[in-house]
Amino acid sequence: MNPMLNIAIRAARKAGNVIAKNYERRDAIESTQKGINDYVTNVDKASEAEIIEVIRKSYPDHTIITEETGAIEGKDSDVQWIIDPLDGTRNFMTGLPHFSVSIAVRVKNRTEVGVVYDPIRNELFTAVRGEGAKLNEVRLRVDSKREIQGSILATGFPFKQPKLMPAQFAMMNALIEDAADFRRTGSAALDLCYVASNRIDGYFEMGLKAWDCAAGDLIVREAGGLVCDFDAGNSYLRSGNIIAAPSRVIKEMLNKIRPCLGAEFNH
């Protein structure tokens, strides 16, 4: 096994144990608001601490970028661990059992390892660049024959950037002409993994951060799916605007989405 994958899995499982234990006693959760519709809990921080401790033991010189702490610079800035210790914090806070731990390893700006762990379902999604993607050690393969007609598409709302809401609803309006239905689950990392595992047919979202989607992005691509930004380019980790789907679906999604976007999306 790839040694960095091994450490990422160990870190994700330890963090998942912290989250699962605290999920059973949510009345003890402490939360603070850090922005518009944006919360952090003591469990996010405890999960993050577990992950950092595991990484630091094996790779003390690597740089770690986390949602809650930001960048923890290491001597080796070529290797970056990009972490969301609890993707789906609001679901966790309200008792909706859908959230995950997301860990990606990027070497010289290329994602080499992706791990997303759902501690409630005990589902571990993994990928190594060039070696494919797996769910609990079973190989994942995107169904390339899928089309947008009758599809189930997942999305997330740009709730931290309300000015993007009109574009969000315009895109949904255009897509529902062909798609059958939408899902809005509250975990971008799991949405991407669900594209990789054929549980949904496509996914799109605006305003994400790298820690939301870096691991899931690799998992989709290693399962044979496509990931791009709204210009069909690859700047999504930077722009936060992402589409993931099998090849036929993504082409049709782009054709529907692009006419809905204003000048702020044109690069």
From Swiss-Prot:
Its EC number is 3.1.3.25. Its main location: cytoplasm. Keywords: Chaperone, Cytoplasm, Hydrolase, Magnesium, Metal-binding, Ribosome biogenesis, RNA-binding, Transcription, Transcription antitermination, Transcription regulation. Mg(2+) binds at residues 67, 84, 86. InterPro entries: IMPase, Inositol_monoP_metal-BS, Inositol_monophosphatase-like, Inositol_monophosphatase_CS, Inositol_monophosphatase_SuhB. Its cofactor is Mg(2+). GO terms for cellular component: cytoplasm. It is an enzyme of class 3 (hydrolase). It catalyses: a myo-inositol phosphate + H2O = myo-inositol + phosphate. Substrate binds at residues 67, 86-89, 183, 212. GO terms for molecular function: inositol monophosphate 1-phosphatase activity; metal ion binding; RNA binding. GO terms for biological process: inositol metabolic process; phosphatidylinositol phosphate biosynthetic process; ribosome biogenesis; signal transduction; transcription antitermination. It is found in: Cytoplasm. The keyword Glycoprotein does not apply. PROSITE patterns: IMP_1, IMP_2. Belongs to the inositol monophosphatase superfamily. Part of the processive rRNA transcription and antitermination complex (rrnTAC). The complex forms an RNA-chaperone ring around the RNA exit tunnel of RNA polymerase (RNAP). It supports rapid transcription and antitermination of rRNA operons, cotranscriptional rRNA folding, and annealing of distal rRNA regions to allow correct ribosome biogenesis. This subunit may play a central role in organizing the structure. Homodimer. The rRNA transcription and antitermination complex (rrnTAC) consists of RNA polymerase (RNAP), NusA, NusB, NusE (rpsJ), NusG, SubB, ribosomal protein S4, DNA and precursor rRNA; S4 is more flexible than other subunits. This is Nus factor SuhB. It comes from Haemophilus influenzae (strain ATCC 51907 / DSM 11121 / KW20 / Rd). The lineage of its organism: Bacteria, Pseudomonadati, Pseudomonadota, Gammaproteobacteria, Pasteurellales.
